[in-house]
A protein has these predicted regions:
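Conserved HGGG/HGGXW glycine-rich cap/lid loop of the alpha/beta-hydrolase fold
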Residues: 8-65
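Conserved alpha/beta-hydrolase "acid-adjacent" motif
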Residues: 201-207
Length: 245
């Protein structure tokens, strides 16, 4: 299924019972809904628990449009895509689970449109994320040399999937980003769960992020890094318990 989000065609999927509580799932950078949430059995887990899953392919990813202009990937625009999807479906609000880039998008939705989201799970996110090496990642996506291991990891991950447009991904990582603002984070009132692998060396200072959000609690998944935390049983169990309130 598709909808128009401020002139950009975005792909989304619906799964689970029509009567289920809606949960929007937003994937990480260079991934897409199916890779992030289906192969890792998140869709199966959530629909099995009775939720109505709304899976979005972010702009520049999956089956959605892939602009090559970094301005098209401003964080506020990508957060706006979530709000416009909720409007398109006429559901008012939804729970939210995002990973890595998807978590950063969810955090921005909390700041810009807090009434669109209910309970929010932010996975693979910290104070910095990968954006401090954005220029290196963009160079890697364009096949240019880089000494950044993080950039090389993302490049190898991205190029393994033919659906990816590496120039669009370079533009995405260079899109305008709003820095973390402790004052704004302190205004969040939605319940928030932050989940990271305890071996994640990409996200930065997760404790600083959690301490800045009054409603946040933190779960660390033992033995998992940024790439391996998504399918972890402990992550799913923590999310289900949290969403149930």
């Amino acid at each position: 299924m598709e909808f128009d989000s401020d002139g950009v065609r975005l792909h989304y999927e619906l799964h689970g019972p029509d009567s289920g509580t809606p949960v929007v799932l937003v994937h990480g950078f260079a991934s897409d809904y199916r890779l992030n949430w289906v192969g890792t059995r998140w869709q199966e887990t959530l629909t099995g628990a009775g939720y109505r899953v709304i899976g979005l392919d972010c702009r520049g990813h999956g089956a959605s449009d892939k602009p090559h202009d970094p301005a098209a990937y401003a964080l506020e625009l990508m957060a706006g895509d979530v709000g416009r999807l909720i409007d398109h479906l006429h559901i008012g609000s939804a729970h939210f689970i995002g990973y890595s880039m998807g978590a950063r998008i969810g955090l921005q939705v909390l700041l810009d449109q807090p009434t669109r989201l209910n309970r929010v799970v932010l996975g693979g996110i910290g104070w910095a994320g990968a954006f401090h090496v954005a220029a290196d990642i963009a160079r890697a996506m364009r096949g240019e040399p880089t000494t950044s291991q993080i950039a090389q990891t993302f490049y190898e991950f991205a190029r393994a999937r033919p659906i990816n447009d590496l120039e669009a991904l370079a533009a995405c990582i260079l899109g305008p980003q709003s820095p973390m603002d402790p004052g704004k984070l302190a205004s969040i009132t939605n319940p928030v769960l932050v989940v990271v692998g305890d071996q994640d060396d990409i996200v930065g200072k997760v404790d600083r992020l959690v301490e800045s959000i009054p409603t946040a609690k933190l779960v660390k998944v033992a033995g998992r890094n940024h790439m391996s935390a998504v399918p972890a049983r402990e992550f799913k169990e923590a999310a289900l318990e949290f969403l149930a309130g």
